[in-house]
Amino acid sequence: MKTSEDLKQILERIDHRGYPAYKDTRGVYQFGTYILGIDHVQGDPFAAPSRLHIQVAGRAARIPGNLYDSKCKKMAVADYLLRNFAKQLERYSFQAHGSGKSGIIQVTRCGQEVLERTACEIEEKTGNIIVRFEVGFPARGRTIQAGELIKILYQYLPACVEKALYYKNMDQNAVKRAAELAVDQEYIREQLKKEGLIAFVADGSILPRESGVSQRPMKDAVPFVSPDSMKVTMKLPYKGVLTGMGIRKGITLVVGGGYHGKSTLLKALESGVYPHIAGDGR
């Protein structure tokens, strides 16, 4: 495998040449405790950014195996890592300068849902972490600015990887809570089948969103309270006792005046097929 020094030599050789020379950088390189892969190089600085990936060995990341030993936990922890990595990348995006998309560093944007994404994967057997992202290779016009890309690959990215993908530098309690929340949510879904329910809304849920174009919870909204006739109690693996409204199989009529929350409730139920991050309210 080529090393980071090999990549730097390529960049120094093609500096100030025409943009297509960037294609010489395609390949996989060893960067200390992680591997950098340059998978696709954009055709010019105004095109869609180049696609890269980073692989951190499990023995270097050191995320405890019990945090990804089930599908739901692995998905939740990978989601947490991706959000953390995205925050770090935002600090450095466009810090390297040039034309068009030069200097952009970005990864898939995450919404309120916790989903299985190819942008971040954890290999169950090895604990290896793979993150896929995009970088705008810098140029002035269509002339390569290799020095700016060296800043990205040798200064900015190592800092992002160090802070976001190594367990010792993470908020370890937050990672643990993300995994536990995923287990609790999965447990509720399993209980629905056993109890003959099709949906469950926990007491204290915040169902309204802050606007019609945002999925974030509304501030100062009135928390949901279950009617006594539909109240259900569950004991979750981590949170413990949880009460809320259980909707049974059959026909349930939702009635009320204008702006009483009928659509808000239905939209929350619709989104309930997906796990959500802590604090979402649903």
Language model features: what each stretch is:
Residues 196-199, 204-212:
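Extended, polar beta-sheet/loop recognition surfaces of beta-rich domains
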